[in-house]
């Protein structure tokens, strides 16, 4: 394992949809800082766009505690749509549930454990596989040991 701080470019990271070179190769790194270079834009137009996007997000994604999107979108489809059509919205395990706003988000109701999240992840994967023949791939990384209970 290389110790120390390294400067990596966008190309070094090998970014792809919901992935990077380091994620694919399972090389643990910690990103301490990132610099983004963008084009020039009107400051007020940028603020207006940010406001519009924030308002849209409030209407389409849960605002409570969650870890964001749980599953990657399969080619030609949307994980949230598949989960919703499979009846997963509101599905609960312990202190966690699939969001009623967007089914690809699992929300914590204050006392959820990692096992509660895992229970819902497996339940969602199973139901989507049974109904649509699609294997949902995790967007998140699981840390720890989990057991199937169903």
Where are these regions (language model features)?
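Phosphate/pyrophosphate- and phosphate-bearing ligand-binding catalytic cores of soluble enzymes
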Residues: 2-119, 126, 131, 135-150
